[in-house]
Regions:
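Surface-exposed acidic/polar loop and edge beta-strand patches at domain peripheries
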Residues: 2-155, 164-169, 173-196
Length: 196
């Protein structure tokens, strides 16, 4: 996919879902609109590391004791969830994928890939990631993050470069358990409207 996959941290992640993690990699990109503020690290799997709404941090933050998957919000592409025995079966063919939660493969490959920024405005960011080995097909993934006055709109697109292939996509958010101080009764409304 890219040279980012050859670093020791990403190699470890491909072998063990719960590997120790050095924290966000590369430079962050910030988006702001109204009472919303978003921070994304393209080189850290296009992970949203911070989402602040009306002064409250909504996402779980990285700390030294965190494992690779345990903070922020990252895209799961080209598969979401678990592939049993790290095997993708398509028709009569079987494809082996990295078993990062042996014996299974979890959450795709996007979370340990470096993404490229292809468009950046004050309230919008579009990122691109090529798809390739160890995924058996060639393609690309586009992720668009847009802040509106009272919402974060996320979009993932998967494009093939030649033959069609099966794929799935989604996000893995780690929300904080408590907004603000323990004695405050502020509530967070999360509204998911899937478009499929």
């Amino acid at each position: 996919m890219n040279n980012e996959l050859n670093t020791k941290h990403y190699q470890a992640l491909r072998r063990a879902f719960d590997t120790a993690w050095p924290g966000p990699i590369g430079q962050p990109i910030l988006l702001e609109k109204g009472h919303l503020r978003l921070q994304v690290f393209p080189r850290d799997g296009a992970r949203i590391t911070s989402l602040q709404a009306f002064g409250f941090e909504v996402l779980r933050q990285w700390e030294p004791q965190r494992k690779a998957f345990q903070y922020g919000c990252f895209p799961m592409v080209p598969w979401a969830g678990r592939l049993g025995d790290a095997t993708l079966t398509v028709g009569e063919k079987q494809y082996a994928l990295p078993a990062n939660k042996p014996p299974h493969a979890l959450h795709g490959m996007a979370c340990y890939s470096s993404w490229e920024s292809v468009e950046h405005k004050a309230d919008t960011l579009k990122l691109r990631m090529p798809l390739g080995a160890p995924w058996p097909w060639q393609g690309e993934v586009l992720q668009t993050l847009t802040l509106e006055d009272d919402a974060l709109i996320l979009r993932l697109e998967i494009h093939t470069m030649s033959e069609t292939f099966p794929a799935s996509a989604g996000w893995h958010p780690w929300f904080v358990k408590q907004l603000g101080q323990q004695n405050e009764e502020d509530e967070l409304l999360v509204c998911f409207k899937a478009n499929w």
